[in-house]
């Protein structure tokens, strides 16, 4: 990180001076919009001494995707909303997701089943001739390839994403519970 040199003839604001004096030994972390606004207002004046500058591009690269999307205050929802609000948000989004999933699932099942039925009908009437020996041979090849490629180790990408999901669920138990309950209700309606 680079440091800025002081400008001559300037006096720092008292609140900013206290804040910056307490942060000189440790890296600069901003936890709320109020602190950020206070720092921005204080930086309009000039400071004496050396301060670290914050490279936002580097900070953004290190943040998880949900922090980039929702901002710094996107921690556990338990800190921001009441229990009823969390359950309501989770339940409504879960119900909507379950309802849409049910409708799309029915449509997809109908399309696949109808296509299979039409293929069977075309085969039965003689429009299509299926070489069942070739199909069986190809299926055996596919089974062998799957046995060869099969491994008991989970890829690291899958493992890291699973850990992110588990962490999110642990931090937002009420929203997650409401979502799954709403999802089941949406699937049933």
Curated annotation (Swiss-Prot):
PANTHER family (alphabetical): FUN14 DOMAIN CONTAINING, FUN14 DOMAIN-CONTAINING PROTEIN 2
Similarity field:
Belongs to the FUN14 family.
Principal place of residence: mitochondrion
Q: What is this protein called?
A: FUN14 domain-containing protein 2
List the record's Gene Ontology CC terms alphabetically: mitochondrial outer membrane; nucleus
UniProt GO BP: autophagy of mitochondrion; intracellular triglyceride homeostasis; regulation of platelet activation
Q: Organism, per UniProt?
A: Sus scrofa (Pig)
MF terms (GO), sorted A to Z:
phosphatidylinositol-3,4,5-trisphosphate binding
Q: Does the keyword Heme apply?
A: no
Where in the cell is the protein located? Mitochondrion outer membrane; Nucleus
Could you tell me which Pfam families the record lists for this protein?
FUN14
> What topology does it adopt in the membrane?
Multi-pass membrane protein
UniProt keyword Membrane, yes or no: yes
Question: Which of UniProt's keywords are assigned here?
Answer: Membrane, Mitochondrion, Mitochondrion outer membrane, Nucleus, Phosphoprotein, Transcription, Transcription regulation, Transmembrane, Transmembrane helix
Q: State what this protein does.
A: Binds directly and specifically 1,2-Diacyl-sn-glycero-3-phospho-(1'-myo-inositol-3',4',5'-bisphosphate) (PIP3) leading to the recruitment of PIP3 to mitochondria and may play a role in the regulation of the platelet activation via AKT/GSK3B/cGMP signaling pathways. May act as transcription factor that regulates SREBP1 (isoform SREBP-1C) expression in order to modulate triglyceride (TG) homeostasis in hepatocytes.
Spans traversing the lipid bilayer: 81-101, 108-128, 165-185
């Amino acid at each position: 990180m680079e440091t800025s040199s002081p400008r001559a003839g300037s006096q720092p604001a008292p609140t900013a001076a206290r804040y910056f004096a307490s942060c000189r030994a440790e890296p600069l972390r901003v936890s709320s919009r109020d602190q950020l606004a206070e720092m921005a207002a204080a930086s309009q004046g000039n400071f004496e001494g050396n301060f670290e500058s914050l490279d936002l591009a580097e900070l953004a690269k290190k943040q998880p995707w949900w922090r980039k999307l929702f901002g710094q205050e996107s921690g556990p929802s338990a800190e921001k909303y009441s229990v009823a609000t969390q359950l309501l948000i989770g339940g409504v989004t879960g119900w909507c997701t379950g309802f849409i999933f049910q409708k799309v699932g029915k449509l997809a099942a109908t399309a696949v089943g109808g296509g299979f039925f039409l293929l069977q009908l075309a085969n039965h009437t003689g429009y299509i001739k299926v070489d069942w020996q070739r199909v069986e041979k190809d299926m055996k090849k596919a089974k062998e390839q799957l046995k060869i490629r099969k491994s008991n180790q989970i890829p690291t990408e899958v493992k890291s994403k699973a850990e992110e999901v588990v962490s999110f669920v642990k931090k937002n138990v009420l929203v997650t519970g409401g979502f799954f309950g709403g999802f089941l209700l949406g699937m049933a309606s």
